[in-house]
Amino acid sequence: MSYSSASFRKLNNVGISQPSQTTTTTTSANQPQSQSQQQPLQQSQQQHLHMKPNPHIPHHQLPGTVGTRTSIPQPALMASNSILTLGPFKHRKDLTRESVLSTYQIMGYIAAGTYGKVYKAKLKSNKLNKTDDDSGIDGINNKDIFSESMNDLHHDNSSSIMINTTTNITINNSLPQFFAIKKFKSDNHHHHINNNNNGGNHLSKGNNSIHQDEVLHYTGISQSAIREMSLCRELNNKNITKLVDIILENKSIYMVFEFCEHDLLQIIHYQSHPDFKPIPCPTIKSLIWQILNGVTFLHKNWILHRDLKPANIMVSSQGVVKIGDLGLARKFKSPLQSLYTGDKVVVTIWYRAPELLLGTRHYTPAVDLWAVGCILAELLSLRPIFKGEEAKIDLNNKKSVPFQKNQLQKIIEILGTPTTDIWNNLNKYPEYLSFTQHFNQNYPNNLSNWFKLINGGNNQNSEKCLELLSGLLKYDPELRLTADQALLHPYFLELPKVNENAFEGLNYKYPNRKIYTDDNDIMTTAANNNNNNNNNNNNNNNNNNNNNNNNNNNSGHQLSQQQNVQIQQVHQMQQQIHSQQLQSHGANSTYKRSGIDDLPGGIRKKRG
């Protein structure tokens, strides 16, 4: 099948490629003029059909021939170009990528968990001028962002919540001074190949060193890291921890966040000292309002946090709440699989909603509001309200989740025994049978008595605070307050007003986070990487030296071969000159056979 040039151009315009044919074209001096004229046309057409060839890819030539080129089928040529160009791109990307230690100065680690470690760091001085102004903390703007949030929630309602934005702390939008770098543990395991050292080989704690009898197998990026990276890149809210950067270095993932000097767990522990009084009412109100504001933002974007607790609620030195640790967070709009299928156990046990304890397969954002209610109660009493003991999962049967009897017991002792009168779908939960078997006694609701007796009966919070707490701790998730409803609760309308700075009015400062420098494995890993790089550089230098020596030897061998060729050429020239001289004097083999030699001047001499 053949195409004319006009029809071929029409096919190009509609995106139809030329039929793939494998042909061999030979170019020589005797080639007809018509074929040589067609080559520019074919080349111009191929430029429109295919990607521009990589100049580093050599032309495909047959060995031992000159001017002969074999063509590749067009789809294969396109595939090879698109694949081979990834190599230079990755190489250029690696050259421009900067390491963690070249950008940040590590001051020590501040927290550790199953996910890995969190380090406090600051930007190096040589990077300050190269960083954009919008890459750091969002900061607190001079405008009343809280009132704007309330206007979005409270469109036509005449009663609006007034937010007190006055503060004595100087706040700006400049680049943050410190960062929190979260290093995830690699999903890997060590496989022993051979062990003949009587158990002498073992991994040293806190690093990734591998001994001679072990091989490190990487199984990929953890699900927690993928969730947190994908969600934090898209979120931008005043009360959500801001992600600054993501660094991939030597199969380790580093997430760089804005740094907060405090968290609620630290504040609660500090206030629980016998010499200190309870947390002031304005501080509690401001903290809870900001938490609800961040949760509202998450839920409006179809995100469940699923791990709200005081340790995951950060507070900046300017009194701004930042919800962090989205490792268990998940989007709940049109999920491909049920929330229970992905994670059978969510939320720390003390803050876990009763529907989760009863084994629900389908839950709603109400699980986050129950956790907020537990946090509010802990801020009021300076201790967890439902401090139960978690039943551990059987290692031999990880698919089954145990019934959390003790945790339910702690909840029932304060909120009373739930019934179908106050919880319509109670008898539809998978663990309802276990619930009826273990809880036969009817407990009354003692939340109001608990509220009056906290802090030795010295509770300065109003009844509106108790109403908010009761609305957040409803058994039935359908009757529980939503984040929007909680933000509009009358508790936030009464005095004292919600402060933009939760620490406004305090005559003391909370201590900063403690920094640990005794186990700084990020530096150890970097040192090992530098040593490996130095070793690689030394090996490369040795290889280069060997190559140079080989090149010198090859060049010397080539010189000797050239000299031998020149000597042979000289001998051949001498023989040619001598034979020409003999022919000029009439010498022939007959005279030589007869024993007569030619002498100069035509004189002959008889031998012997």
From Swiss-Prot:
One of its GO terms (molecular function) is protein serine/threonine kinase activity. It comes from the Eukaryota. ATP binds at residues 110-118, 182. It is an enzyme of class 2 (transferase). Keywords: Activator, ATP-binding, Kinase, Magnesium, Metal-binding, Nucleotide-binding, Nucleus, Repressor, Serine/threonine-protein kinase, Transcription, Transcription regulation, Transferase. Gene3D superfamilies: Phosphorylase Kinase, domain 1, Transferase(Phosphotransferase) domain 1. Component of the SRB8-11 complex. The SRB8-11 complex is a regulatory module of the Mediator complex which is itself involved in regulation of basal and activated RNA polymerase II-dependent transcription. The SRB8-11 complex may be involved in the transcriptional repression of a subset of genes regulated by Mediator. It may inhibit the association of the Mediator complex with RNA polymerase II to form the holoenzyme complex. The SRB8-11 complex phosphorylates the C-terminal domain (CTD) of the largest subunit of RNA polymerase II. Component of the SRB8-11 complex, a regulatory module of the Mediator complex. This is Serine/threonine-protein kinase SSN3. The lineage of its organism: Eukaryota, Fungi, Dikarya, Ascomycota, Saccharomycotina. The gene is SSN3.
